[in-house]
Curated annotation (Swiss-Prot):
It comes from Rattus norvegicus. Induction: By isoprenaline. Prolongend stimulation does not change the percentages of secreted forms (with gliadoralin A 1-90 as predominant form). This is Gliadoralin-A. Residues 35-109 have a biased composition (Low complexity). Predominantly proteolytically processed at its C-terminus before secretion to produce the major form gliadoralin A 1-90. Further proteloytically processed after secretion to produce minor forms. Potential substrate of transglutaminase.
Length: 109
């Protein structure tokens, strides 16, 4: 019983150390069966997929170039006057208007 348990543990450890071994063999078999035009792989990537990637990158670059770049200031924001510079006319007029006086409520005696 102990011998069987040890064998199972050894087999489990050996398969855990090299789990892709069967996959590598099967992928080599598939590569051998394919015609030579489909075997052209460079760095694990076929020529077709490389061409597809290049076309996608080129189209992405073209679409980015065609899109207008957003301007930094799209809306006019009121600017704070720098010390020593006069305020714009509209702000000067607003400052000259008299402000309504605050009346304190009368207290009942």
């Amino acid at each position: 019983m102990l011998v069987i348990l040890l064998m199972v543990v050894v087999l489990a450890l050996s398969s855990a150390q090299d789990p892709n071994r069967d996959f590598v063999v099967s992928s080599q078999d598939v590569r051998e069966r394919q015609p030579s035009s489909q075997q052209g792989t460079v760095g694990g990537q076929s020529q077709e997929s490389q061409l597809r990637d290049q076309q996608q990158q080129q189209s992405l670059q073209q679409s980015q170039e065609q899109q207008p770049q957003p301007q930094l200031q799209q809306t006019k924001q009121p600017q704070r006057p720098v010390k020593g510079q006069p305020l714009p006319q509209q702000q000067q007029q607003q400052n000259q208007r008299p402000r309504p006086r605050y009346q304190q409520p009368r207290r009942a005696v």
